[in-house]
Amino acid sequence: FLVKKRLAACCNIFPVESISWWQGKVGQNKEAVLIVKTLEKNFQKIEKEVKKLHGYKTPCILEIPLKRGNLKYLNWLKEEVG
């Protein structure tokens, strides 16, 4: 849905097994990690969309600044969501 809305140029979804401390005990759950390839300006819109759909009260939504990358890929990304 983020790609269709032009908020992301590409998304990757990975199934994972998570172990975390939650509400006083260790829990283990099957989850999915979503990597959204986009521009910084889209973060707040993406955060809002993910929170609407996510099943957790406190989903992990992080912005990881990019230091370097393939220039052709970065130009493509800007063209798609810029």
Question: What residue ranges belong to the model's regions?
Answer:
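Positively charged, small/polar-rich N-terminal and surface patches that mediate targeting and assembly
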Residues: 1-82
